[in-house]
Design a protein with these regions (language model features):
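Exposed aromatic-hydrophobic patches
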Residues: 25-26, 67-74
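Tight coil/turn sites that cap or link beta-strands
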Residues: 19-21, 64, 76-78
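Extracellular carbohydrate recognition and processing domains
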Residues: 15-18, 59-68
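Core-facing hydrophobic residues within beta-strands of well-ordered domains
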Residues: 31-33, 45
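Noncatalytic modules at the cell exterior or secretory-pathway interfaces
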Residues: 34-36, 72-88
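Short, surface-exposed beta-strand/strand-loop-strand elements in extracellular ectodomains
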Residues: 42-61, 91-94
């Protein structure tokens, strides 16, 4: 993935492909990630992790159901959604 503009506007979604890393950057490389909603109903990707650019894992998410994960962390260089699962997963970013 990673084709096109890597910046994601507030409230928009992207789909992470199987065995891929997608770099998500807030506009202007700053802002707090308020929540990340991962998964779609009936879709599983049990190995989806959210990491910073150094590979530090902030969340491991079971996407067997749609759920919100409150991170409340500041990402100055974006966040990586790493999908090591067997199906795509949807990631929705909301930040303030």
């Amino acid at each position: 993935m990673g084709i096109g503009n890597p910046y994601i506007e507030n409230g928009l979604s992207l789909y992470t492909a199987v065995a891929s890393t997608h770099v998500i950057k807030t506009t202007g490389n700053k802002g707090f990630i308020a929540s990340v909603i991962v998964g779609t109903a009936g879709v599983t990707a049990p190995s989806l992790t959210l990491q910073n650019s150094a590979g530090t894992i902030f969340a491991v998410i079971d996407t067997s159901a749609v759920r919100a994960v409150e991170l409340n962390l500041k990402f100055t260089d974006g966040i990586n959604a790493v999908n090591a699962g067997t199906t795509p997963a949807k990631v929705t970013i909301t930040y303030v």
